[in-house]
């Protein structure tokens, strides 16, 4: 058997169940980061006793990772946003089918494994299931949700799709009240509109732009990994990569013509 979190849910969406993928991904990431810290710093520096470390490792090996697929059976149409009946999607609930939720819901909590975590990039089946999940959810949503989706599509290496959502996120919205089902954009002062105002959308959109230009995960720095085709030339300076590397890029005709990587901590860089 595996260890699962009891009585969890996919935030603001659907039923309560044990072993919710969102919670499992969070817990697995916590254990994984803890063990990586121990490998780098040593258990003593981390304040972990030998027996505690053994227990952490035992639990880590048995944690349900919250990464499973199901098949889209056409309940919302034979084809929705390019997802066809029979295509695989990532499970949002461990036991309930995707139809337990709302098509087009603003939250995509089981997508944490793609961004901000990096748990499925090296698994083609899960990666494809995740992109199908994003397609099925749709693009237009609340302001903060579109900010997250920009990052998700950038991490999925689809710069044009990320740019399409960026354009939606930058459309003008002028109105009162609260809309949980769409209508997001920006106000004249450039504050993100859920609606109402939520700073998450501003931070998310700018993070998404950075994610299109520079990514760092799995010990690697990726230059222009999700460059939109409309950004044929440009310049970006001072981007931070994991490990305290500072990256600057100039590109022309969709190709980098100048790359500068400053190693701020003297760490290995290949």
Region locations from a protein language model:
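Aromatic- and carboxylate-enriched substrate-binding clefts and catalytic-loop regions
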Residues: 1-22
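A general structural signal for short secondary-structure junctions and capping/turn motifs
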Residues: 2, 18, 104-106, 213-214, ...
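Glycan-recognition and catalytic regions of carbohydrate-active enzymes
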Residues: 186-187, 217-248
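Active-site core of glycosidic bond-cleaving carbohydrate-active enzymes
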Residues: 20-220
């Amino acid at each position: 058997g595996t260890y699962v979190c009891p009585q969890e849910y996919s935030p603001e969406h659907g039923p309560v169940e044990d072993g919710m993928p969102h919670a499992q991904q969070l817990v697995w990431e916590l254990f994984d980061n803890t063990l990586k810290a121990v490998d780098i710093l040593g258990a003593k520096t981390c304040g972990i006793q030998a027996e505690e470390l053994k227990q952490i490792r035992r639990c880590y090996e048995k944690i349900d990772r919250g990464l499973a697929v199901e098949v889209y059976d056409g309940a919302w149409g034979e084809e929705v946003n390019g997802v066809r009946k029979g295509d695989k999607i990532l499970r949002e609930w461990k036991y309930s089918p995707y139809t337990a939720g709302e098509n087009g819901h603003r939250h995509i909590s089981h997508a944490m494994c793609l961004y901000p975590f990096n748990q499925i990039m090296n698994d083609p089946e899960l990666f494809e299931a995740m992109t199908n999940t994003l397609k099925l959810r749709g693009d237009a949503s609340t302001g903060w949700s579109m900010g997250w989706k920009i990052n998700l599509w950038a991490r999925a290496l689809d710069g044009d799709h990320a740019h399409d959502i960026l354009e939606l996120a930058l459309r003008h919205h002028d109105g009162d009240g609260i809309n949980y089902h769409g209508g997001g954009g920006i106000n004249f002062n450039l504050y993100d509109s859920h609606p109402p105002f939520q700073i998450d959308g501003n931070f998310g959109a700018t993070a998404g732009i950075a994610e299109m230009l520079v990514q760092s995960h799995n010990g690697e720095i990726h230059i222009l990994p999700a460059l939109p085709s409309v950004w044929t030339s440009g310049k970006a300076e001072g981007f931070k990569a994991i490990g305290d590397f500072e990256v600057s890029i100039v590109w022309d005709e969709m190709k980098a013509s100048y790359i500068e990587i400053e190693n701020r901590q003297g760490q290995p860089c290949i």
